[in-house]
Structures are given as C-alpha cells and as structure tokens.
C-alpha cells in the first residue's frame, strides 16, 4: 500500500509548499522510491484553464491534456516524472462531480452535504492516484493557508484519511514561517505556534514542521517550536532561503527531512543518490559566460505567467555553462517605442504564448527585429503564430495578413481555426490539449537538435498555420521543419538563413527538466551565446552567481 504525505501551509500564502513537496519527492526518488504528487486547490474554478495569467500565473499542461496549477510543473521537473489530470484537483471539480452524482441519483435521495459527500469525493481522488500509478508515496499539497475558509473541506478530508489508511501510512507536514523582526533583533516563533494551534483545532497534529526563514534557525528557537508545537526536535526542519529553488532538495536532505519521513512511515531507510543533482547545482553556480535574453510577452508584470519558460531557459543555461539575465519586455511598449530600444543589446529573443489581440503587433515587431538583425529567436505557440504573421507581411508581401483569431474578416488569414474547433462553444478544456506526435523534416536545424524523426510535445491552442499559404511560404524561404504525422498541421517552422530562428506551435517548456534540458532551449541558448556573450570575471566567478532559474 502507498504511504500518504500531506503538506499544508501556515502564516502566509506563497510560503513554498510546492517546492517543499517537490523537493521531498526528489529526495525519495533518489532513494529508488516511486512518487506521485497531487495538488488540491481550494478555488471554485473547475481548472485554471480560463483564469487570467495575472491572477493565477502559468497554466501547466500535462501529457493527457489537463490544464493545471503551475506547481505541477515543479513536481515534474524535480521528480522527472510526468503527472496527469489525476494529480490536479480543485474545489470546483469536486463540487461538479458531487452535483453530477446527485443529478444521476447516486445518493438515492439523501441530503448532499460537505461531510460526508464532499470529503469522501476528496479522499476518493487521493486514493485514485495511488490506485492508478501504484507509487510508494503519494504526496498531497493542500493549496491556501490553514485558517482559510476555502480549505476547510480539504483539511477535514485529510484529517479523516489517517483513520482510513492507517496511522503508519499517513504523515502530516506543515510548512510555516519564522520571521526575523529587525527591531527586536530575533526570529519569532509565535506565528508558527498559532498556525499549529489552528491546525490542531481542526484535528490535525503535524508530524513534521518545515520552518521557512531567511537565516539559520537558532537551536533555542528550534527547541521552543518543538516544545510549544508538540513536535520532536529532530522533526523541526529548517528551510532557509536559497538563491535557486534547485538548492532546496540538498538543504532539506542535510536537515534530515527524508530520513525523518521514512522513519515515521516505517519505511526502509536507504542511501540517497544525489550526485547528479549536486553536480547540477555546482555547475549552476560556476558559469563561464554571461548574456542577456529578452522575453517579449503580454503578461510580463507577473513573471510566473511564463514560469516554465524561465525554468527551461535556466536548464539550458546550466548545460551551456551560461549565466543569463532575463529582460522582461512588454510587447505593447515595443508598439509605442520600437523594438531597438529594448532589444538592441540582447543575445537572444523569446516570444512566448498568450491569447488575444493585445500586444500582438509588438510581438510581430520584435520578431522582425530578430530576423533582420540575426538575433537568435525562439517562438512558442502565439510566438510561432506571430512569426507567421511577420513573415507574411514583410517577406511574402501580404500586408493585410493576420490571424483569424484577431481579425475574423482578414483577407489573408495565415493563422486559422483548427477544423475540429469550429463548432466549439465552451472555453474550458476544449482546446487542442496534451501530448501529440510531430514528424521532423530531415536536414533542418530542428531535426539536428532533436536527433530523431518523431517527437512528442504538449499543445494548448485552437489556431494553426493556414495550409492555403504553405506553398507561398516555402517559395519565399520559410521552412516547415515539423508537422503532424499526416502532414496536415504545421507544428514547427524555421528560417535557415539565420543563426537560430525556430518557432513551435507546441509548448516545449513543459518537457524540459533540470538534468535534461529541452533540445530547442539548449540550441537557442547555445546560439545566443555565440551571438553575444561576455566572459565572467574571476571576481564574479568567486561569488554565488544567480542564474535565471532563481528568478522563480
């Protein structure tokens, strides 16, 4: 039977529960245990697919086409394991399932209540992950903060879980904040004490406390937390701020988190194999060269809207021994002031995905600037569609070319709605979603980077390249370097007379891993480094250099 670990958070939101859960998953996997990580989100949306990126951040897409919380990206990157729609649960999806059962008569006329019907549905979702993937451990992160009214059904469900699964099969881990009060000159444990008190009032006594702090936790404070929170001292774990999230598993390993977890769940203690992860972190801290990369987007006010793009650039930077500084460029600013003001000093330009007309002309201008000035360019989803519009207008001389998404009356709709999308009415969960095969064209840079003919990538879109214009594009020098296996859908384009000009309809950022950077990001960073980079001085080299992945 699987062991179940529940990760809750207290005092403040965004405390790092997802990174703690992902790091624990990495530590257990390094001991040859299998792990699946589940996120319970308390919002009433069925999934985050239709939520604003400014509110929610990135929507992470799984292989089976689920639109999920960005924390699932952390889970996949840290454990190098693909998650599924089973690993993402929201209050909205729980209530939707319960109401559907009530409408079918499954409850046989009974009064449907939070307890037991909602809590039973929550527990069923957790057990389903264990049954479908058969892992040694199921780690469940509960979104929100203890004390939030939205989280109460989830907390009640996991309280009941220990009785049903058995005391030795369930562990409660609470992530909390230990703030430094500068006026007092000390760290304060009272917020943690109150957070644990709140959790205990619900009926959950945490087995392990993970204390987030910006400096080492003094022994006296650790003893105080142990005494007042009724947690053994060795199970009070410090999680100090790090320059990169990829340092956190190593820090928690030194603190004994995995060792205590295995002891409490009566599992065999094993020696971890973290050599590859340690080498990754060491290499990240010792880059040879520095360069500047621009991300031209429409949601740049919230960097988390492009989290997987940032992480993928970081993975590729490590593999190329590069330190990169990201420059966030609002596409609308380019529309007002021109591209050269923001992009002249860049080693590479990334144009990521998005929806809607706002900022598209700025993206098109950025892509034209990259093409004309031989600056390495990588376009993703809307970034590819924008590159098609740019080529159509400026090279193929179709001056009124546009996407049917933005101008349904366009005379030259070089981007058009997928045929299967024409009768779709609902927005949520109806796009082309999930993992699809793509056949690469030999003798292209894309083929060279992947090193294989058929690849599999994750999609999230309704619109595609309009094949009515394919011949014209090929005649003017555009290369189609990847299509669906039947050749019907254009998935990758590139421009051969350029150091690196590749754009994809899919989202390669969802497939990148710290120890396995995505080939397209690797090639992009390599080309950008060749275009414009500077050696790092000995003085800087002796410092802890902050890579792009630490931005998240």
UniProtKB/Swiss-Prot annotation:
Molecular-function annotations in GO: ATP binding; CTP synthase activity; glutaminase activity; identical protein binding; metal ion binding
Binding-site residues for ATP, renumbered to this chain: 14-19, 71
GO cellular component: cytosol
Binding site for L-glutamine: 354, 382-385, 405, 462
Annotated region (Amidoligase domain), positions in chain: 1-267
CDD domains associated with the record: CTPS_N (cd03113), GATase1_CTP_Synthase (cd01746)
Xref: InterPro entries: Class_I_gatase-like (IPR029062), CTP_synthase (IPR004468), CTP_synthase_N (IPR017456), GATASE (IPR017926), GATase1_CTP_Synthase (IPR033828), P-loop_NTPase (IPR027417)
Binding site for Mg(2+): 71, 141
Residues involved in CTP binding: 13, 148-150, 188-193, 224
Residues annotated as domain Glutamine amidotransferase type-1: 292-534
Activity control mechanisms: Allosterically activated by GTP, when glutamine is the substrate; GTP has no effect on the reaction when ammonia is the substrate. The allosteric effector GTP functions by stabilizing the protein conformation that binds the tetrahedral intermediate(s) formed during glutamine hydrolysis. Inhibited by the product CTP, via allosteric rather than competitive inhibition.
BP terms from Gene Ontology: 'de novo' CTP biosynthetic process; pyrimidine nucleobase biosynthetic process
EC number: 6.3.4.2
Record-listed UTP binding positions: 13, 188-193, 224
Active site residues according to the UniProt entry: 381, 507, 509
Region (Disordered): 533-552
Protein family: Belongs to the CTP synthase family.
Other comment: CTPSs have evolved a hybrid strategy for distinguishing between UTP and CTP. The overlapping regions of the product feedback inhibitory and substrate sites recognize a common feature in both compounds, the triphosphate moiety. To differentiate isosteric substrate and product pyrimidine rings, an additional pocket far from the expected kinase/ligase catalytic site, specifically recognizes the cytosine and ribose portions of the product inhibitor.
The protein's role, per its UniProt record: Catalyzes the ATP-dependent amination of UTP to CTP with either L-glutamine or ammonia as the source of nitrogen. Regulates intracellular CTP levels through interactions with the four ribonucleotide triphosphates.
Complex and partners: Homotetramer.
Name this protein carries in UniProt: CTP synthase
Organism of provenance: Picosynechococcus sp. (strain ATCC 27264 / PCC 7002 / PR-6) (Agmenellum quadruplicatum)
Gene: pyrG
């Amino acid at each position: 039977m699987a062991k179940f670990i529940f990760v809750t958070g207290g005092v403040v939101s965004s405390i790092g529960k997802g990174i703690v859960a992902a790091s624990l998953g990495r530590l257990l996997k390094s001991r040859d245990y299998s792990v699946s990580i589940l996120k319970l989100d308390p919002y009433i949306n069925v999934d985050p697919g239709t939520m604003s990126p400014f509110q929610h951040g990135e929507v992470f897409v799984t292989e089976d086409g689920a639109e999920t919380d960005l924390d699932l990206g952390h889970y996949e990157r840290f454990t190098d394991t693909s998650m599924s729609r089973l690993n993402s649960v929201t209050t909205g999806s729980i209530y939707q399932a319960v109401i559907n059962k009530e409408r079918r008569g499954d409850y046989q006329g009974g009064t449907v209540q939070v307890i037991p019907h909602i809590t039973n549905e929550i527990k069923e979702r957790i057990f389903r992950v264990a049954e479908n993937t058969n892992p040694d451990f199921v780690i469940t992160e509960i979104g929100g903060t203890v004390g939030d009214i939205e989280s109460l059904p989830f907390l009640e469900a996991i309280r009941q879980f220990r009785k049903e699964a058995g005391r030795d099969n369930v562990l409660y881990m609470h992530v909390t904040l230990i703030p430094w009060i500068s006026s007092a000159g000390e760290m304060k444990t009272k917020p943690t004490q109150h957070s644990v008190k709140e959790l205990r009032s619900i009926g959950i006594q945490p087995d392990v406390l993970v204390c987030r702090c910006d400096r080492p936790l003094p022994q006296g404070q650790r003893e105080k937390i142990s005494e007042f929170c009724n947690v053994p001292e060795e199970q009070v774990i410090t999680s100090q701020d790090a320059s990169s999230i990829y340092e956190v598993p190593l820090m928690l390993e030194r603190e004994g988190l995995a060792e205590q977890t295995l002891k409490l769940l009566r599992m065999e203690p094993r020696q971890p194999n973290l050599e590859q992860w340690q080498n990754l972190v060491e290499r990240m801290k010792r880059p040879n060269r520095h360069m500047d990369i621009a991300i031209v987007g429409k949601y740049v006010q919230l960097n988390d809207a492009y989290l997987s793009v940032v992480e993928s650039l970081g993975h590729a930077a490590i593999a190329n021994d590069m330190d990169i500084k990201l420059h966030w460029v609002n596409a609308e600013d380019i529309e007002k002031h021109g591209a050269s003001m923001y992009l002249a000093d860049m080693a590479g330009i990334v144009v990521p995905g998005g929806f809607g007309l706002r900022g598209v002309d700025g993206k098109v201008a950025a892509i034209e600037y990259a093409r004309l000035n031989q600056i390495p360019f990588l376009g993703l989803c809307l970034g590819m569609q924008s590159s098609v519009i740019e080529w159509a207008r400026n090279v193929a001389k179709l001056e009124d070319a546009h996407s049917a998404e933005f101008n349904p009356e366009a005379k030259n709709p070089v981007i058009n709605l997928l045929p299967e999308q024409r009768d779709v009415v609902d927005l949520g969960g109806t796009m082309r979603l999930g993992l699809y095969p793509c056949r690469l064209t030999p003798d292209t840079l894309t083929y060279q980077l992947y090193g294989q003919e058929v690849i599999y990538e994750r999609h999230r879109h309704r619109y595609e390249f309009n094949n009515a214009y394919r011949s014209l594009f090929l005649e003017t020098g555009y290369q189609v370097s990847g299509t669906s296996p039947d050749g019907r859908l254009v998935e990758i384009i590139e421009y051969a007379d350029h150091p690196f000009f590749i754009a994809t309809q899919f989202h390669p950022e969802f497939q990148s891993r710290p120890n396995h950077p995505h080939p397209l990001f690797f090639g992009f960073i390599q080309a950008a480094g060749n275009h414009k980079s500077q050696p790092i001085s000995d003085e800087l080299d002796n410092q802890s250099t902050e890579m792009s992945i630490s931005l998240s």
